[in-house]
UniProtKB/Swiss-Prot annotation:
<comment type="similarity">
    <text>Belongs to the methylthiotransferase family. RimO subfamily.</text>
</comment>
<keyword id="KW-0949">S-adenosyl-L-methionine</keyword>
<feature type="binding site">
    <location>
        <position position="150"/>
    </location>
    <ligand>
        <name>[4Fe-4S] cluster 2</name>
    </ligand>
</feature>
<dbReference type="GO" id="GO:0103039">
    <property type="term" value="F:protein methylthiotransferase activity"/>
</dbReference>
<dbReference type="GO" id="GO:0046872">
    <property type="term" value="F:metal ion binding"/>
</dbReference>
<dbReference type="InterPro" id="IPR005840">
    <property type="entry name" value="Ribosomal_uS12_MeSTrfase_RimO"/>
</dbReference>
<protein>
    <recommendedName>
        <fullName>Ribosomal protein uS12 methylthiotransferase RimO</fullName>
        <ecNumber>2.8.4.4</ecNumber>
    </recommendedName>
</protein>
<keyword id="KW-0408">Iron</keyword>
<dbReference type="InterPro" id="IPR012340">
    <property type="entry name" value="NA-bd_OB-fold"/>
</dbReference>
<feature type="binding site">
    <location>
        <position position="146"/>
    </location>
    <ligand>
        <name>[4Fe-4S] cluster 2</name>
    </ligand>
</feature>
<dbReference type="GO" id="GO:0035599">
    <property type="term" value="F:aspartic acid methylthiotransferase activity"/>
</dbReference>
<feature type="domain" description="MTTase N-terminal">
    <location>
        <begin position="5"/>
        <end position="115"/>
    </location>
</feature>
<keyword id="KW-0963">Cytoplasm</keyword>
<feature type="binding site">
    <location>
        <position position="153"/>
    </location>
    <ligand>
        <name>[4Fe-4S] cluster 2</name>
    </ligand>
</feature>
<dbReference type="GO" id="GO:0006400">
    <property type="term" value="P:tRNA modification"/>
</dbReference>
<comment type="function">
    <text>Catalyzes the methylthiolation of an aspartic acid residue of ribosomal protein uS12.</text>
</comment>
<keyword id="KW-0004">4Fe-4S</keyword>
C-alpha cells in the first residue's frame, strides 16, 4: 500500500499571504498530499512566514522553532524567506527556504523531502481551490507587489513591483468562488486603486463582454455576480470617485478601505505618501454625497519619526472632521530595511502609547455616536458564527469586514434557526462602541 505523505501547514501574516497559502495547499492537494492540523502527525511542516514588521519576524522565527522542536522537518516560505541568512542563523535545521510566490522551488523542496508516488489527484481539489477562510467569504487577490515607495514599508523589496492579473483571469476565479457557495468577496492587493497600471489596462473578455483591466471595470464586472463585494487597500486617487456610484446603485458594497496613515503634510511627506488633507476631506464628503450610507475605513500610524505635537493635533483635528466609520491605528515601529529607520527625532514609546490611546479614545467616541443611528432599524447580516451553548450568533452588516470591523450579536440563534454563511434580517436594539446588538 502506498503511503501518502502528510504535510502540516502554518500560515502567518496578512490576507495576501493567506491567499498564497491557499494556492500552495491547492497544489499540494492536487498532487495527492494529505494536509494535517498537527505537527506530530505530519511527515513535514511548511511555515508560510510574514517579514514585514519586526514583531512579525519574531513571531515567524518563533513558529519555525516550534515546528522544528515538535516535528523536525521544516520548510520555510513567504516574505521572511527573503532573509534566508537570518533564518539559517536562528534555525540551521530548516530544510529549505523560499521567498514569496516562489511556488515552483517550494514544491520541488516538498518533492525532495517528502516524495509522493506520481498520480493525478486533481479530482480531490474543488474547482475554486482550497480555501482557508470560512466557506461563505473569500479573499480575491487582484495583483502582487507595489509601485509606491513609502519610507516605513518594505513590501516592494519583498514582493516586487506591481504585477496585476488580467481581468478575465480574476473574473473566472470570482465565478468559481460564487459557484462554490462563497457569498462575500474581499478584494485585496497592496494598492487596489492602481490595479492594471502595469499591464496598461489590458482588455479581457468575460461573459461575452469586453472589460479593461482597471479597478472601475473590475468593480463593475464583480457587481454583476450579485455577491457582497468589498474593496480593501484603496488609495484615494481621483478615479476612485467613479467607483462610488456603483455603491450607490447597490452593485458593490458601500464600503471603502482607504489606508490614509496620517493627515499632517509634514508627516506624509516623510512617509512619502500621496495625500493632501483638504483634498482628502473634500473627496470623503463627495463620496458621502454620492452614496450617503458609504462606510469608510482607514488605518493610521502615530509616533512616526519627527511627528511633533502639532502634527498629532493635526491628526486629531482631521479625525474630528472626517468622522470615519471604522479606524485602526498602530504605533510606529521600525521595519528592517525601511528608509524611515534612518530618520532622526525618534518618538519615545511612552509618547507613542499616549498618542495611540488619545487617538483611539476619540475614534471610539466617534464610532459610538455613529452606530447609534442603527438602533431601531432592520439590517441584513451575514452569519459568521453560532454559539450553541449560550444561544447567540455573530454576524456582520454590509458595513463591516471580517476580522477587523464590528459585529452584530444576535440573540435566540437556535430558535431563529440561524446558520453560518446564510443571510438574515434582524432588528438592531442596542449599540456599543464598535458593535451592534440584535434581538
Amino acid at each position: 500500500m502506498i503511503k501518502i505523505p502528510k504535510i502540516g501547514f502554518v500560515s502567518l501574516g496578512c490576507p495576501k499571504n493567506l491567499v498564497d497559502s491557499e494556492r500552495i495547499i491547492t497544489k499540494l492537494k492536487a498532487e495527492g498530499y494529505d494536509l494535517v492540523d498537527s505537527y506530530d502527525n505530519a511527515d513535514m511542516v511548511i511555515v508560510n512566514t510574514c517579514g514585514f514588521l519586526n514583531s512579525a519576524i519574531d513571531e515567524s522565527l518563533e513558529v519555525i522553532g516550534e515546528a522544528i522542536a515538535e516535528n523536525g522537518k521544516v520548510l520555510v516560505t513567504g516574505c521572511l524567506g527573503n532573509k534566508a541568512d537570518l533564518i539559517k542563523e536562528k534555525h540551521p535545521e530548516v530544510l529549505s527556504i523560499t521567498g514569496p510566490q516562489d511556488y515552483e522551488n517550494l514544491i520541488e523542496a516538498v518533492h525532495t523531502h517528502a516524495p509522493i508516488f506520481a498520480n493525478d489527484f486533481v479530482s480531490l481539489v474543488p474547482p475554486q481551490g482550497i480555501k482557508l477562510t470560512p466557506r461563505h467569504y473569500s479573499y480575491l487577490k487582484i495583483s502582487e507587489g507595489c509601485n509606491n515607495t513609502c519610507t516605513f514599508c518594505i513590501i516592494p523589496d519583498i514582493r516586487g513591483k506591481l504585477k496585476s492579473r488580467s481581468i478575465d483571469n480574476i473574473m473566472k476565479e470570482a465565478e468559481k468562488l460564487k459557484n462554490a457557495g462563497v457569498k462575500e468577496l474581499l478584494v485585496i492587493s497592496q494598492d487596489t486603486s492602481a490595479y492594471g497600471v502595469d499591464i496598461k489596462y489590458k482588455s479581457g473578455i468575460w461573459n461575452n463582454k469586453e472589460y479593461q483591466s482597471n479597478i472601475i471595470d473590475l468593480a463593475t464586472a464583480l457587481g454583476d455576480l450579485d455577491m457582497w463585494t468589498r474593496l480593501h487597500y484603496v488609495y484615494p486617487y481621483p478615479h476612485v470617485d467613479k467607483i462610488v456610484p456603483l455603491m450607490a446603485q447597490g452593485k458593490i458594497l458601500p464600503y471603502l478601505d482607504v489606508p490614509l496613515q496620517h493627515s499632517s503634510p509634514e508627516v506624509l511627506k516623510r512617509m512619502k505618501r500621496p495625500a493632501h488633507t483638504q483634498k482628502t476631506l473634500d473627496r470623503i464628503n463627495k463620496w458621502r454625497d454620492i452614496c450617503p450610507d458609504i462606510t469608510i475605513r482607514s488605518t493610521f500610524i502615530v509616533g512616526f519619526p519627527g511627528e511633533t505635537e502639532a502634527d498629532f493635533e493635526h491628526l486629531l483635528d482631521f479625525a474630528e472632521k472626517a468622522q470615519l466609520d471604522r479606524v485602526g491605528c498602530f504605533k510606529y515601529s521600525e521595519v528592517e530595511g525601511a528608509k524611515a529607520n534612518q530618520f532622526d527625532n525618534l518618538i519615545s514609546e511612552e509618547v507613542k502609547q499616549q498618542r495611540l490611546d488619545e487617538f483611539m479614545g476619540l475614534q471610539a467616541q466617534i464610532s459610538t455616536d455613529k452606530l447609534q443611528r442603527f438602533v431601531g432599524t432592520e439590517q441584513q447580516v451575514i452569519i459568521d458564527a453560532i454559539n450553541k451553548d449560550e444561544n447567540y450568533a455573530i454576524g456582520r452588516t454590509k458595513y463591516d469586514a471580517p476580522e477587523v470591523d464590528g459585529q452584530v450579536i444576535i440573540g435566540d440563534a437556535l430558535e431563529r434557526n440561524l446558520k453560518v454563511g446564510e443571510f438574515a434580517t434582524v432588528e438592531i436594539t442596542e449599540s456599543t462602541e464598535y458593535d451592534l446588538i440584535a434581538d
